């Protein structure tokens, strides 16, 4: 299967799995655990099917780093604390980062896939900003995170993007924590500005990753 097919299959599987988690009404910790597992399984799938790639020791090391990054991403996006827009904001930023790295390194197919994933999550974000309406469900988080994990894995295995730059993108999932050092107050304006500040911090991280990759 092509990378596009793999990502589409994994994204759909993550979405369905997340929907199952949502419908079954798992309590907080089991729910988090299952959401965290989904993107990690997606990355394992990509690595297991990577026989067409010639993996060096450095590549294997970076795959381990990406695996750890995916674990961190799952932990950070499955939390119940904070704004309901936190997880979609981080996932949109991650998709944007993968788009930039793919594009500047000439992997336009993965860039397009990253853009589609980002715009899909961005639609949910736009519907919930500046007025928050609906919390992100497990289907959205698991589906998007699984797709992005697959993109990150394929990007590293393809060899056109340095593993270091992709690993740096993992810091995006701490953007909300870094943005927390700036306070806009607890009113409606403050709540509306927080996701934008998270995106601004994430954009800085993407810029660093792009510089390293160039």
What are these regions (language model features)?
Residues 111-117, 124-214:
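C-terminal transmembrane helix-loop-helix hairpin of multi-pass membrane proteins
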Residues 1-80, 178-214:
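N-terminal topogenic module of multi-pass integral membrane proteins
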Residues 35-157:
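Generic multipass alpha-helical transmembrane bundles of integral membrane proteins
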């Amino acid at each position: 299967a092509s990378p596009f097919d793999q990502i589409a299959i994994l994204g759909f599987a993550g979405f369905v799995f997340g929907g199952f988690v949502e419908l079954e009404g798992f309590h907080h910790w089991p729910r988090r655990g299952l959401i965290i597992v989904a993107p990690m399984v997606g990355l394992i799938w990509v690595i297991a099917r990577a026989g067409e790639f010639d993996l060096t020791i450095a590549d294997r090391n970076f795959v381990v780093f990406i695996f750890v990054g995916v674990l961190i991403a799952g932990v950070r996006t499955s939390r119940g604390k904070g704004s309901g827009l936190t997880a979609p904001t981080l996932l949109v930023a991650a998709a944007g980062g993968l788009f930039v790295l793919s594009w500047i390194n000439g992997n336009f197919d993965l860039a397009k896939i990253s853009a589609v994933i980002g715009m899909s999550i961005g639609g949910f974000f736009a519907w919930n900003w500046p007025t928050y309406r609906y919390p992100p469900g497990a289907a959205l988080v698991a589906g998007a995170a699984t797709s992005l994990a697959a993109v990150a894995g394929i990007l590293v295995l393809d060899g056109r993007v340095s593993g270091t730059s992709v690993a740096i993108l993992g810091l995006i999932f701490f953007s909300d924590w870094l943005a927390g050092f700036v306070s806009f107050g607890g009113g409606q304006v403050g709540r509306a500005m927080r996701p934008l500040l998270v995106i601004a911090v994430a954009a800085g991280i993407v810029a660093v990753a792009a510089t390293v990759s160039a």
